[in-house]
UniProtKB/Swiss-Prot annotation:
Residue positions binding Mn(2+) 2: D13, S63, D445, H446
Residues reported in the UniProt entry to bind Mn(2+) 1: D404, H408, H464
Name assigned to this protein: 2,3-bisphosphoglycerate-independent phosphoglycerate mutase
Function: Catalyzes the interconversion of 2-phosphoglycerate and 3-phosphoglycerate.
Lineage: Bacteria, Pseudomonadati, Thermomicrobiota, Thermomicrobia, Thermomicrobiales
Taxonomic source organism: Thermomicrobium roseum (strain ATCC 27502 / DSM 5159 / P-2)
Pathway named in the protein's UniProt entry: Carbohydrate degradation; glycolysis; pyruvate from D-glyceraldehyde 3-phosphate: step 3/5
Reactions the enzyme catalyzes: (2R)-2-phosphoglycerate = (2R)-3-phosphoglycerate
Length: 524
């Protein structure tokens, strides 16, 4: 094949097009390069939050999700969104793994156990998924459904657990199925740091009914609050009947559904429940045999469980498309964003594709980045320019971390300085690309420095934003792409298909994004 034109993709991390108000560090900054590019070349904006990047509605984007979508050329639905969509379209209620658990729970003497973090934090789980499981059990006529409720207080307010529990109890009453069998703070039930003594307390309560007791789940939480113990740290508590007997424990042959969708804090308890042989982390009070265990997501490939929602594997990211046709590529960023231009951009793949070179530029060792707002952008630029002018690569990927990382500090003047530094660096990249008659594509993954004050107040805002990001196509003067029209309504998943069109490469079926180019020049 003929060598395609070189394309350099620059990701301005945390640079969105925000409101014109005193908290917008990007508007406050002197950015002659970006101003000229936006005024001179084809430009549009891209949505980078919510369903457009595979997140729940209205949830702000982040660097991991942004780079996944940029590299995949399709919307990569995060697990929480995949589960939400399955509930919406009804496929959740036909899920094969869940049906297997229901079949087991229908057998005489069996119990269906639903285990996980309650609340609306959305980081490890979401209560609406538990409520959907309860509805599923009710539809199936399962007589015994035991809920083992883990309280949050970390991704939710410290004492919001009681309200989430009340919502759960109301659902149990409405559906006329199920009961709460144990209450445990996530500090114990969801440890991830090999503090197995914490996991043991949760295990003992869930499997053997050992530990402190309460007559109701509300009593367990209210008593903890009275002792100054917030949701995260509620000691595993067994709910007992009038005779002091546990309402339910996990027994031989039962069915268990662990409804957390994030793996890291679900692994230890799952291992304790399923490891038949060499488990030595703590002495188990009892090990229930012949469990049928379902996990909402894949926690570990080797766990002997059924997985309700298998990983969404990005099999053909942009980096692979380029590699498969023998093109070389170069990815660079400083430490803070290196994983994003490698692992995440490549669809969750650690190893480089054949022909892919990478360069990590160390981030400065400072307590906070407002103390050095330029971070390592000049050094990243040096590396990128060298790669571009070498003409060894058909594709160069560059990330500038400054608008995001300095924006997170909340120091407005430093964020302005960070934006101005990145603008100068972008000018150097543009010159290098021009020198080899290449194409420069400028975009971002999400916003940050565009809103640093809560509107109408002087309160500092340090989180990401839900503003669209720029997409600018800088083409050589002789190129048919020099004056194309770019469509509106695009999203990050449309960037890779656009790059493939510029390079004259076919778009694989797996990439469901659409090129942003809608009106190529006459004579192309």
């Amino acid at each position: 094949m003929d060598r395609p034109p070189m394309v350099c993709l620059v990701v301005l991390d945390g640079w969105a097009i925000g409101p014109d108000y005193p908290g917008n560090a990007i508007r406050a900054a002197h950015t002659p390069v970006m101003d000229r590019l936006q005024a001179t070349y084809p430009m549009t904006t891209l949505r980078c939050w919510g369903r457009d990047v595979g997140l729940p509605d209205d949830q702000m984007g982040n660097s991991e999700v942004g780079h996944l979508n940029l590299g995949a050329g399709r919307i990569v639905y995060q697990l929480i969104t995949r589960i939400d969509l399955a509930i919406e379209d009804g496929s959740f209620f036909q899920n094969e793994a869940f049906q297997r658990a229901l079949d087991r729970a229908r057998q005489p003497g069996r119990t269906l156990h639903l285990m996980g973090l309650i609340g609306d934090g959305g980081v490890h789980s979401h209560q609406r998924h538990l409520l959907a499981l309860l509805e599923l059990a009710a539809r199936a006529g399962i007589s015994r459904v035991a809920v083992h409720a883990f309280t949050d207080g970390r991704d939710t307010a410290p004492t919001s657990g009681i309200e989430h529990l009340r919502e759960l109890l109301a659902a149990l009453d409405r559906l006329r199925t199920g009961f709460v069998a144990t209450v445990s703070g996530r500090y114990y039930a969801m440890d991830r740091d090999k503090r197995w003594e914490r996991t043991k307390l949760a295990y003992d309560a869930i499997v053997c009914g050992l530990g402190q007791t309460a007559r109701s789940p509300l009593e367990a939480i209210e008593r903890s609050y009275a002792q100054g113990i917030t949701d995260e740290f509620i000691v595993p508590t067994v709910i007992v009947d009038a005779e002091g007997k546990p309402l339910a424990t996990i027994n031989d042959g039962d069915a268990v559904i662990f409804f957390n969708f994030r793996a890291d804090r679900a692994r230890q308890l799952t291992q304790a429940l399923t490891d038949a042989g060499g488990f030595t982390a703590f002495p188990r009070c009892r090990w229930p045999r012949d469990l049928l265990m379902v996990t909402m997501a894949e926690y570990e490939p080797h766990f002997p469980v059924l997985v309700a929602f298998a990983p969404d594997i990005v099999r053909v990211p942009l980096a692979r498309v380029l590699s498969d046709v023998g093109l070389r590529q170069f990815h660079t960023a400083e430490t803070e964003k290196y994983a994003h231009v490698t692992y995440f951009f490549n669809g969750g793949r650690e190893e480089p594709f054949p022909g892919e070179d990478r360069l990590l530029v160390p981030s400065p060792k400072v307590p906070t980045y407002d103390l050095k707002p330029e971070m390592s952008a000049p050094e990243v630029t040096d590396a990128a320019v060298q790669a571009i002018v070498s003409q060894r690569y058909a594709f160069v990927l560059v990330n500038y971390a400054n608008p995001d990382m300095v924006g997170h500090t909340g120091v407005f003047a430093a964020a302005v300085a960070a934006v101005e530094c990145v603008d100068r660096c972008l000018g150097r990249i543009e010159q290098a690309v021009r020198s080899v008659n290449g194409y420069l594509v400028v975009t971002a993954d999400h916003g940050n420095a565009d809103e640093m004050l809560v509107p109408g107040t002087n309160e500092v805002w340090t989180a990401h934003t839900k503003n669209p990001v720029p997409f600018i196509l800088v083409a050589p003067n002789h190129s048919p792409f020099r004056s194309v029209a770019l469509r509106t309504g695009g999203r990050l998943a449309d960037v890779a298909p656009t790059i493939l069109e510029i390079m004259g490469l076919p778009q694989p079926e797996e990439m469901t994004g659409r090129s942003l180019i809608v009106a190529p020049s006459v004579g192309r």
